[in-house]
Amino acid sequence: VETHQPVTRYGAPSGPVRIGLLDGHRVAFLARHGEGHSLPPHQINYRANLAALHALGAGRVLALNTVGGITADFGPRVLGCPDQLIDYTWGRISTICEEPGTEVVHVDFGEPYTRSLRNDVIAAAAAAGVALVDGGCYGATQGPRLETRAEIARMRRDGCDLVGMTGMPEAGLAREMGLDYACLAIVANWAAGAGPDPDEVITLQDVLDNVAAASSGLPRLIASLLARQTAE
């Protein structure tokens, strides 16, 4: 495994980028929350993270996001690949088009996730026998606190199926940088008031167990995705 500590024009990324071989394919991994999960969502340097991956040769980014479920198809232990998102964050640097001399580019963001990569992920999951919900809307909130029941009720009315804290500005920045980008949403728990028991108390152990269950097929899915990329 190679370990890289790149510094980009946007500063340092959240931590080292590790590059290794998976079934003969070079794969880069970067923990967006930093070593030991030390960075809250609003303090992540999303620009530097993506720029570091880009500089090391990455052209496709598969983002892993732990989320809460809002609608019935996205209960705990579900793995999803959303096709839409709504941004509720604020105060985060959300563009690379703000430095002096930088050309302002108004990128098309009607489909926030790259369709070709999403299609490959969905096909790879099917080939690997990994259950995956195709579609859904990810609502990106500010964090690090969790949401109120009223906020989740509003998000449901807005059309959100999932809620997380790191989906934006990451997806928008990836589009500006020309990176293919898709999300694998790992449902850890019901969002506030969204489950069948609105008074349910979620424990840390519940969350850890649910994440482990939803993530169990990821190695097979990713291996299948890499095999498809080679075939293409």
Labelled PLM ranges:
Residues 191-232:
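His/Asp/Glu-rich mid-to-C-terminal helical/loop segments that flank catalytic regions of hydrolases
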Residues 1-109:
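Metabolite-binding pocket within alpha/beta catalytic cores that recognizes anionic/polar moieties
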